From Swiss-Prot:
Organism listed in the record: Autographa californica nuclear polyhedrosis virus (AcMNPV)
InterPro entries: Baculovirus_E26
Record's keyword annotation contains Lipoprotein: yes
Function of the protein: Plays a role in the sorting of ODV envelope proteins to the host inner nuclear membrane. May facilitate the fusion and release of nucleocapsids into the cytoplasm. Modulates the expression levels of IE0 and IE1.
Top-level taxon of the source organism: Viruses
Assembly and interaction partners: Interacts with proteins IE0 and IE1. Interacts with protein FP25K. Interacts with host importin alpha-16.
Post-translational modification: Palmitoylated.
Chief location bin: host cell
Localization per Swiss-Prot or TrEMBL: Host nucleus inner membrane; Virion; Host cytoplasm; Host nucleus
GO CC annotation terms, alphabetical: host cell cytoplasm; host cell nuclear inner membrane; membrane; virion component
Keyword DNA damage: no
Keyword terms: Early protein, Host cytoplasm, Host membrane, Host nucleus, Lipoprotein, Membrane, Palmitate, Virion
Protein name according to UniProt: Protein E26
Length: 225
């Protein structure tokens, strides 16, 4: 009996449940936790056209940053061009004044032939500046120089220049003529030396009236002498 029991005990010990072996844990790491960090790299695909456009824009920005404008040089160039245009305009007006002088000289030889003007006669000049008509009285040299200056500096328009018997009388006659034709739409300044038109469209009509009056009066003065 004892041998049988001994065998049974031995066989039961062989089929006993297996116990897991506990691993030794260090004293300082009883409550420590182990974390596993997983990094994920996401690669985005950028279209090629976008990259090219971006490079072009960056290149333009860089070029603009490196561009420095010399405004003084630009201003100097514009001043030179403006000065050149002013010189051309001055030469043009001088040529016009010279041609007018030659034309009037030729007219004097044909119209006033064998007629000697009295010594007290002075030259009477008329010029248009925008919406204003100016009159000038003096010797021939002074009047022609003043007309040339106005035409050159103020882009004025030559209207009339001729020797007259009484320039002050002509001024008063022109003031009466323009006032009768245009009324309050024309303003008389400086003892009838200057006539300003309120309506710029009427200055052409006023200029024609002045020329006609002065030409008619010139012929009558010549006939009187």
């Amino acid at each position: 009996m004892e041998s049988v029991q001994t065998r049974l005990c031995a066989s039961s010990n062989q089929f006993a449940p297996f116990k897991k072996r506990q691993l030794a844990v260090p004293v300082g790491s009883v409550n420590s936790l182990t974390h596993t960090i997983t990094s994920t790299t996401v690669t985005s695909v950028i279209p090629k056209n976008y990259q090219e456009k971006r490079q072009k824009i960056c290149h333009i920005i860089s070029s603009l940053r490196n561009t420095h404008l010399n405004f003084n040089k630009i201003q100097s160039v514009h001043k030179k061009k403006l000065r050149h245009l002013q010189n051309l305009l001055r030469k043009k007006n001088e040529i016009i004044a010279e041609l007018v002088r030659k034309l009037e000289s030729a007219q004097k030889k044909t119209t006033h032939r064998n007629i000697s003007k009295p010594a007290h006669w002075k030259y009477f000049g008329v010029v248009r500046c925008d919406n204003t008509i100016r009159t000038i009285i003096g010797n021939e040299k002074f009047v022609r120089r003043r007309l040339a200056e106005l035409c050159t500096l103020y882009n004025a328009e030559y209207v009339f220049c001729q020797a007259r018997a009484d320039g002050d009388k002509d001024r008063q006659a022109l003031a009466s003529l323009l006032t009768a034709a245009f009324g309050s739409r024309v303003i008389v300044y400086e003892n009838s030396r200057r006539f300003e038109f309120i309506n710029p469209d009427e200055i052409a009509s006023g200029k024609r009236l002045i020329i006609k009056h002065l030409q008619d009066e010139s012929q009558s003065d010549i006939n009187a002498y």
